[in-house]
Amino acid sequence: MSYTVIYAGTFDPITNGHLDIITRATKLFAKVIVAVAQNPTKQPLFSLSERTALVAQSCSHLTNVEAVSFSGLLADFARQHHAKALIRGIRGSDDIEYEIQLSQLNNKLADGLETVFLPPAVEWRYLSSTMIREIYYHQGQVNAFVPTAVVQALQNRKNNE
């Protein structure tokens, strides 16, 4: 399809689960904008510009992906970028009710904006950025769970502490 879609999140940091969803979305849609959100209610490990750069580096092999940072309403961002749909990953039943509510709200706010739900590959179903940060804070190894750019950024952060 020749549609632009948006996959939004804080991506703090981007994980292999996120990358799986992005890669699969690129096979379904002409352009995937990975919208890296500024969320004032969260204290991120990486700054907005760092997170956006990590997404861009991690997706550099995907020619139809663009990493863009944003703040404000996702519905407004989608309208500005002429997106036809949002991509959302659903790991399990815990995510479904919340994601359906978001989908309906964004549909109303952006006049018909659709949401496409993609479950992650089985090997990434349990994975979240929160878990990666926990492993990192406790000096664990995250190499198997995140793209190389994130491994390097975490190592650099650890070396500078």
UniProtKB/Swiss-Prot annotation:
UniProt binding sites for substrate: 10, 42, 74, 88
Binding of ATP, residues: 10-11, 18, 89-91, 99, 124-130
GO terms for MF: ATP binding; pantetheine-phosphate adenylyltransferase activity
Domain of life: Bacteria
Predominant location: cytoplasm
Reaction(s) the record says it catalyses: (R)-4'-phosphopantetheine + ATP + H(+) = 3'-dephospho-CoA + diphosphate
A Pfam family of this chain: CTP_transf_like
CDD domains: PPAT
Family: Belongs to the bacterial CoaD family.
Cofactors required: Mg(2+)
Keywords, alphabetical: ATP-binding, Coenzyme A biosynthesis, Cytoplasm, Magnesium, Nucleotide-binding, Nucleotidyltransferase, Transferase
Function description: Reversibly transfers an adenylyl group from ATP to 4'-phosphopantetheine, yielding dephospho-CoA (dPCoA) and pyrophosphate.
The keyword 4Fe-4S belongs to this UniProt entry's keyword annotation: no
Lipid metabolism in keyword set: no
Gene3D superfamilies tied to this protein: HUPs
GO cellular component, one term: cytoplasm
Annotated GO biological process: coenzyme A biosynthetic process
Site (Transition state stabilizer) residue list: 18
Subcellular location, record wording: Cytoplasm
Species lineage: Bacteria, Pseudomonadati, Pseudomonadota, Gammaproteobacteria, Pasteurellales
Pathway info: Cofactor biosynthesis; coenzyme A biosynthesis; CoA from (R)-pantothenate: step 4/5
Enzyme class label: transferase
Subunit and partners: Homohexamer.
Enzyme nomenclature, EC number: 2.7.7.3
Annotated protein name in UniProt: Phosphopantetheine adenylyltransferase
Chain's gene name: coaD
